[in-house]
Amino acid sequence: MAYLIFSLSLLLIYLGLALALHVQFGMLGIANFGVVGFWGFGMYMMGIFQAELNMSFVDALFIVLVLSVAVSALMGWLVVRLDPQATLCTTIAFGAIIALLVVTEKWITMGVVGLGTIRYPFRIGGATEYIYFFFLVGIVVGMQVLVLRLHKSPTGKLLQAVRDNEELCASLGKNTFQIKMFWFVLTSVVMCLLGALSAPLNQFLTPNMIVPSVTFAVWIALVLGGKEHALGAMVGVFVTFGFFDILIETYAPVSPELAVVVPNMKLFIYGLALMAVLVFRPTGFLAPTTPPERVWGEMRKVAATAGSGGLALAKAGKDRLEATVFMPAKTTPKKSSEAGADEEAKE
């Protein structure tokens, strides 16, 4: 039962990471492949403050919050203006740098030896793990509710508009850099805090926890569930981590000979499922909550009446819309008959 609670708690952490990535990529269009970097940074900072400096959970969490804002703001300043390919390389490099620092900076991270033991914040006899589990449930449920409300709010529509056509939003007076910067920093800080909450769950931290497979697992879950749907992250995490890591690997009646093959088979099935979804259902198991036409409907109305006759033409594609803004000619040439009449009047 204790291992089940641990597995479900870890599932909640992955669900929180997927929700944060959903806002970053699904709503805003920033491809963050450094999820494990933010998560690992928060986890190791919490471990250092609690295990090495003997701080309380609340004090350590507050300092992790401050440091996370600084690191996320630095990364946001670097990646927000970049194109998708450069963003991909930069965020992957960030995750690799965090993993390298954990190994090399032995004076504070203990290197490959590991760091621990990290205490649970709530210690009430044998119910400590259960209380922490329900604590995580409350946090992740709150995140899911906020994401659902964000999708229905004007802010959510604005994020989707920036994702689909940043140039058009900028032409309408929206500060797209500020919008992307704020939401990237906010969601990255959430990833760091989820890492901090993972530290008491693992209790003993080692560098082999900060591996790219964490990022790929979150991405696969989001793509399978539906990157643009408010519930896509939840569905994807339950299908991948919940089904394979909890039900199959833990409770399926597998012989000892096949138990070694199950983890590799899991990755193989992940790959097949991902290819099938990308080919037959690119939007994931769930369709987008808000059709692009509905998002751009209001934008077209605003563009059509914006300053000195500006006109916006939106063309609906399968997954996104491309918009073109042009200015009408300043003068309209007169017809030949009208021009001749004017000349005769002057004479």
Q: For each of these PLM feature ranges, what is it?
A:
Residues 1-347:
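Transmembrane alpha-helices and adjacent helix-loop boundaries
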